[in-house]
Amino acid sequence: MANRINVLFVCSKNQWRSPTAEAVYRDDPRVSVRSRGTAKSARQTIHAADLAWADLVLVMEDKHRHRLLADFPGDTKYLPIQVLHIPDDYQFMDPELVELIRFSAEPFIEAAATKA
């Protein structure tokens, strides 16, 4: 098996979506995962060290990608940041959210894992 890739999931407050994504992929042998939020009030706020750790960043909405590019221009210059287009309409581990995360994230994770 190739090396594991480091996947960082990002939403606003690191409360429902990105922690759910982290839980969904926690035991996947292809990846190591973290989740962070872009808001100053996030449970775990994103820092430059998180971006340095990541091989792939999966954000829930366009606004998260824009925030990362604005706040961390040097750290994101060559980092793949993909938007999953998952709205903030779900609670932690909501079955529909889990399904959306798997459906949206899997192509990016599979592509990155294949390259690793």
Tell me the role of every PLM-derived stretch:
Residues 1-116:
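Short polar/charged helix/loop
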